[in-house]
Amino acid sequence: MTIDGTGQSKEALQDERLNTGSDKVYQNYMMPALELYDAKVSINHWQLRDCIKPGSMNQSKLYYIYDHSIRVLDTDSSVLRSPVRRHNSIQPSNSGKNSTEKTSTKGSRTTGSYISKNLHVPSEKLVEFNFKPRCFTELNGLTVCGGLIGSDDKGFPSNWNRLAQDANISLPPPSQPINISKNISFPINSHYSNPNIWKGIVEFYNQETDTMMTFTLGQFINNCVTLYDRASMQFDLFACNNDGHLYQCDVSNRDVTLVKRYADLKFPLNNASLSHDGQTMVVSGDSNKFAVYNQNELTNQFSLHYDNHPSWGSSVNRVRRIPRFALPDESEYIENIYEAPNSDHGFYNSFSENDLQFATVFQNGTCAIYDIRNMATPMAEISSTRPHSHNGAFRVCRFSYGLDDLLFISEHQGRVHVVDTRNYVNHQVIVIPDKVNMEYINERKHNTNHNFTTNNNNENESNDSKNELQGADYRSLSRRRFSLPSMPNVTTEPWITMAQRIPKKYLEPQILPFPKVMDKISNESVLFSTKGSSSSDVAHPYKRRCSFRVRRVSTSAPTADYSNNNVNASLGTPAADSIATSSSNSAPQNLIDPLILSHQQASNDVFEDDEYYEAYNDVHSTYRVSSDYHGVSARAFESFLRPPSTPDLPSDDDNFAANSRNNRGTSNFLRRPVITTQESNEFSEENNISGIDWVEDRNGSSLIIGTDYGIMRWNINSWARRSFSSYDLC
């Protein structure tokens, strides 16, 4: 039988293009939409970036660090996510202005009131400590923070005395020495033997009793605190200190007591991770070595002196033959201190759900995954996109649970890795958009107003300025375009980011295959190379989605205006989202110029048959000129802000939106990144990753990412992850 390959169907040809060669499709592990909460997360130590954690009793509640306090954000809102899953909320269309009006009228009835009413989730302050938390954890209502006594803390002796003098009262000491068990002995004539000069801090807060306690623990900073509940209201606390010691404390309703001091590793310790059953603990620090401890159930303490534990999956115990009359060699005992290849300083460890595998990450951009049953060599190694660099250093890693089978790893800035743990080969990278440098913008804010008015006297001057942009004056002119309207609650609510002032499409992250991001130093180079490669490849209508929708959620306190809007919305008055449903040329007053972030714009690289996303692009394909620049026409505004290589913009935004559907190449120039110059590097910088975590609640499993713009909650495509499709050729 002869098979004619020329008569293949259209679907077969498309499948062949998408699954072979450079057009291979990578499955999107994340859902097409995510929420961005404008909650500011503080990084109180530049290397410790595990500042966000889900609640142990309610994972929808996110605990995060802000300055001296711990704040709580409740992300459990079924009404908040319901409009996203209704695909008929925004109708696709194929016409121009009429389609936009249709979307505006229908969208206002279906989604306008819901969106404006529900995209507001205020955050709350849980507790404020006397010392800045550098790390923290929460378990069953007990919150513990670690740090040190710093000069910028309220509890610093001089600052504390000043507070007492200003209040004209006698304040109790901000901290007290921790109780030490009699079984602990310290080296004589050592600075560790005098707890009175310890500078490490551990702070406790009990939500049930609303009590707070602060103790000094360790000679230097405590880089990590870990809790394990042994019984009701009885915990084991493990604190990693820069003095090279791991401290184990007994926490109960009576007191906090130091019961054990581990000094096996002779370098500063950064992280201690416990398995879910509490039997195994991995400790790493400023070295490429890490220790794997095993718990003695009789003493409730950990030790490195053990051999082969039957509960780790091996039923055969190792037997050593010792010659008769020979003394046993103590050096033959397994110390369980391992050296990871191609690594330097360890910063985080994480166990999988079954406790059989764990991942440990290092500062040079290496992640080693080990099987606890065979520690000879790592079973897999994950590399950073920027190894041996500051912004590419690995900081935090997390395993997902259930059937998701994913490993998340955060870099120091800008990127989060998503690795398929079924084979450790499928590897994608989430690229977070760069942030605006507010300090740079504020320095030049006073040069903005008079420059806008002088550049719009007549059309001749507009054309002259367009020609001047070609020369050396473009750099000086470009400095005048950076201005941000003032945020109304910036002084009263400093825990709010500027995410509400940035257009949504410039907050959209991208997911790219690891080979496309490897060795790209900046995110601008990643996006620019992606656009260049996509234009050179053979175009086909089915492309993998790499840009994702962002739904901004305000975390500010409710105001009178917000309350009135809620009343109107509840009475049936439509309060439509001006960005999603309006067809006018004016935008909200709090938008900045999108072109200052044009290098961050994601490409329109999505499935053409995705009607929901197509309708979204039709509405958001053009930016709106802000009406708060009085006396400036849209044409002059656009020509002034346009880089010299950018073609003229159409004067009618709605016509441009209609043309963009018929000619994708015309609309993509707004989505192409501008080549980086020294000037652009001054007003934009990479987003700091303040933490990642995995949560699962009634809304599904989600990835939590902390950025400078706020906290992202991104649902995982769990239905797609439940497919174990494979085939063999016989």
From Swiss-Prot:
Compositionally biased tracts (Low complexity): 449-460
Protein name (database record): Uncharacterized protein YLR149C
InterPro entries noted in UniProt: DUF2415 (IPR019417), Quino_amine_DH_bsu (IPR011044), WD40/YVTN_repeat-like_dom_sf (IPR015943)
Keywords attached to this entry: Phosphoprotein
Pfam (any one): DUF2415
Feature: compositional bias, Polar residues: 89-98
Species whose genome carries this gene: Saccharomyces cerevisiae (strain ATCC 204508 / S288c)
Chain positions with Phosphoserine modification: S82, S89, S483, S651
Region (Disordered): 82-114, 447-468
